A protein has these predicted regions:
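Hydrophobic transmembrane alpha-helices and their immediate junctions
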Residues: 117-120, 144-152, 242, 264-309
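Structural signal for the C-terminal ends of transmembrane alpha-helices
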Residues: 17-27, 111-117, 148-157, 281-289, ...
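Transmembrane alpha-helices of multi-pass, membrane-embedded glycan-processing enzymes
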Residues: 6, 10, 23, 36-39, ...
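Long extracytoplasmic/lumenal interhelical loops at the membrane interface
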Residues: 198-265, 286-291
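A membrane-periplasm/extracellular boundary helix in multi-pass inner-membrane enzymes
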Residues: 44, 48-54, 134, 154-204, ...
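Transmembrane alpha-helices of multi-pass inner-membrane enzymes
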Residues: 159, 279, 301-350
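Alpha-helical transmembrane segments of multi-pass inner-membrane proteins
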Residues: 9-17, 29-153, 165, 308-311
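Membrane-anchoring hydrophobic segments
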Residues: 1-23, 29-40, 326-350
Length: 350
């Protein structure tokens, strides 16, 4: 419980520091450049880790790991389709490949919303590659949702979005029809597409990931019921899982951020948090439509998509309460909303 509260304190402190610092538009621009620069470096490192043997010393696959007092990670701990291969996915500045994927999904909208075509295309491709290498179902779903919301709500290209979905569905349907082809090369491609489809739908459960995640959730909901909906307290879900003996003999974190909030905070607190989250997201959506200040509109559009994509992506991590990019996203979102309101107030008073 104490460690959990410490994470919350650090996270809120980061968000508040961002809000306090971003008291002017110029400072907000500087902050975005600093955060963007750090995440851009991580993106480059993740690409190196994806296609070369390069690893940061803190990576769970680094040969230097023992000098940091840590043991090599059990790859089966990750919900990853490469679990039985020799491939080791990128981790960037994070210990867990899922956490890297979530960080990438949060910066994807800033590339998508860029007015520079080359930045938009190269950034989107790079992040998509990293997320595929991380092979996280929840984050991949977040990527699809972000692109759909970008085309539907930001660019308002409903026809383009519909065409893309028709092509994708047609591709999978066509591959399904070709799965019985006598041509071995066509048959191999078709079956690979079918395997990908089954994996994304959860019909292929790598390492029993979906099974133990469901068990963790069921244990948490049972504890919530015993508390009469009041919650088990901050960090309380971990001791409950430990008393049971841990799921699959080793998992004690909830591995679902939203269920974690519900189980630990209770129904009332959870409802307040969800209401707050929806309010922030809606305000960012309004800013994405405000054309009088292109920079604030850009920030609002990107953060709106990031908040949307984070909803499914947050399920990928064991917990995001200690995930600093989430707290940075919250701080930047509130800062942009305040900047928008200051601009609107200034317009009405002049």
């Amino acid at each position: 419980g104490g460690k959990y509260l410490f994470y919350i304190f650090c996270g809120i402190s980061i968000s508040m520091a961002i809000i306090y610092y971003s008291s002017s538009k110029d400072k907000l621009d500087i902050l975005f450049k600093i955060v963007g620069g750090i995440l851009l470096v991580e993106l480059c490192i993740a690409l190196l880790e994806s296609f070369t043997s390069f690893r940061l010393p803190i990576s769970p696959y680094s040969s230097w790991l023992q000098y940091f007092g840590k043991d090599p990670v059990s790859f089966s701990d990750f919900d990853n389709i490469f679990v039985y291969s020799d491939f080791r996915p990128p981790t960037g500045f994070h210990w867990n490949t899922n956490n890297l994927a979530i960080a990438m999904i949060l910066i994807l909208p800033f590339f998508l919303c860029s007015h520079q075509i080359i930045v938009k295309v190269l950034g989107t491709i790079a992040i998509t590659v990293i997320i595929i290498m991380a092979a996280s179902r929840a984050v991949f779903l977040g990527l699809i949702i972000i692109i759909c919301f970008y085309l539907g709500f930001i660019k308002k290209k409903i026809a383009t979005l519909s065409l893309i979905w028709m092509v994708i569905l047609g591709l999978f349907w066509g591959m399904a029809q070709l799965s019985e082809s006598q041509n071995p090369r066509i048959n191999e491609i078709a079956n690979s597409m079918e395997a990908l489809s089954l994996y994304l739908k959860g019909d292929i459960d790598v390492g029993g990931s979906l099974e133990w995640r469901r068990e963790l959730v069921n244990n948490g909901l049972a504890a919530l019921k015993e508390s009469n909906g009041l919650g088990v307290g901050a960090g309380g879900s971990v001791p409950i899982q430990e008393k049971i003996g841990g799921v699959a003999g080793r998992f004690t974190s909830m591995h679902n951020f939203w269920i974690e909030l519900l189980v630990e905070g209770g129904i009332i607190f959870f409802s307040l948090i969800i209401g707050w989250y929806i309010s922030i997201t809606y305000n960012l959506f309004k800013i994405s439509k405000w054309r009088e200040n292109p920079e604030i509109q850009y920030y609002g559009s990107a953060l709106f998509l990031a908040m949307i994509g984070f909803v499914p992506a947050a399920i990928a991590a064991s917990s995001t309460i200690y995930f600093f990019p989430m707290w940075i996203m919250f701080g930047l979102s509130i800062s942009v909303i305040y900047a928008y309101r200051r601009k609107r107030f200034h317009q009405h008073t002049t």
